[in-house]
């Protein structure tokens, strides 16, 4: 599949925004082809979840030492194999806007955080919605991604999601000229 010119650059910037909070054990929700390990030092444990089987097959070829699971976040619970594990870092990079029930997935993620672990979320801002539509039309972004957006979350709604599942918001910031936002929550001990 040909990748639109700006999609990879934007993905790189998302990862760079998250790197300061990434620890040695990572659950990457919406991992795609598992590009996150390219941006961080070697990890003790990396587990990727994604809905797209083709992406997971490529990820498994690139990283045979890591675990990958197919999962539709709107229709399924996390794999039972993960329920006894705890992760220092859980990422949801550009995922929540694709979900009909983001609270369900944030709650499941929070349950798998280790004490003092971080949940890192990036999502487009309302400004980026229109920019994304124009960019997709021009072939700069994936057209499918725009069509799949089910919700637009702002700072208040993201903060509410984190607080509702018992996380303390430690960082919120916009980046990429206000088109994306990063929120980091820490599990309360």
Segments the model singles out, each with a brief description of its role:
Residues 98:
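Histidine-centered divalent metal-coordination motifs
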Residues 120-141:
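Conserved class I S-adenosyl-L-methionine
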Residues 1-85, 89, 103-106, 146, ...:
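Conserved N-terminal segment of class I S-adenosyl-L-methionine
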Residues 77, 116, 127-129:
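Feature marks short, surface-exposed loop/turn motifs that line or immediately flank catalytic pockets
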Residues 89-95:
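A short beta-strand submotif of the Rossmann-like class I SAM-dependent methyltransferase core
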Residues 185-189:
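C-terminal beta-strand of the catalytic ATP-binding
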Residues 104-115:
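A short glycine-rich, Lys/Arg-flanked "PGG" loop and its adjoining helix->strand segment in the class I
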